Amino acid sequence: MRQPFTLHNFVITIKDMTMFEPLAERLRPKSLDDYIGQKHLVGEGCILRRMIESGHISSFILWGPPGVGKTTLAKIIAVQVNAPFYTLSAVHSGVKEVRDVLLKCKADSGSMFTKHRPILFIDEIHRFNKSQQDSLLGAVEMGTVTLIGATTENPSFEIIRPLLSRAQVYVLQPLSDDDLAELLQRALTKDEILKRRTVKVEETDALFRYSGGDARKMLNILDLLYQSVGESEPIIIRNDIVTERLQQNPAAYDKNGEMHYDIISAFIKSVRGSNPDAAVYWLARMIEGG
């Protein structure tokens, strides 16, 4: 017999559904104290931490490779200063969507219940063309909205000068091996799924090398290791196992999609870091994907 619907059952169902979220999403930091990396920006006494602690957020652009915490940092800032938060993806939004969200921001700015200016976060802002970027200028200049843009491309080439003159650019760096080690430890001890499993960390060289300073990529690899063993088997992190699993399970690659740019970035970082194994792997991913 089907169990009757109750609010209790519904809440449990929603809670269970969160267990199917990707590991990277389950571990997304909610505060600056949980944020890993970018100490030059969010460490004690550094520019972004001082800005957040003061509550006075000015418009800025976060420039860095994929998986280094650009989106997470923007969300943390909005929570810390208790500001209305709107987000747009430049890949899927046009001038109409920009104008619609700016109208909402204007309404929030004039509300007696809003203490701080609304924050508009635009991911992949370099994908906006000139007219789309122009549509932001008035709201930014008048203080209707605080703009936070995220880009993997050099803003000097991709962002129009009038917008750059109104927004400071902050550079985010790939995560170091120490950062990745801290993230790995957090995943194994804090994640509701992984902390119930037996995990044997024997070697981390391959895990960190294939991650290329990208937190999301490392957590996705860890997720793959978890999914590739039975529930009663231990999860073993060792160089040969990591390499074998990645070769057996090439992730989806869409040369016209966002993953295309993530993989190109990983390939370039592997070459620059003199990691031939990782470079060959990411090159093979691109060739196989067309």
Can you describe what each PLM-predicted range is?
Residues 238-290:
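C-terminal engagement/docking regions of AAA+ P-loop ATPases
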Residues 89, 168-181:
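Conserved AAA+ ATPase "SRH/arginine-finger" region at the nucleotide-binding site
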Residues 43-45, 85-118:
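Short glycine-rich substrate-engagement loop in P-loop NTPases that contacts/grips substrate
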Residues 166, 179-195, 224-228:
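Conserved AAA+ ATPase "sensor/coupling" helix adjacent to the nucleotide-binding pocket
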Residues 50-88, 137-138:
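Walker A/P-loop
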Residues 205-210, 216-231, 243, 265-269, ...:
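C-terminal helical "lid" of AAA+/P-loop NTPase domains
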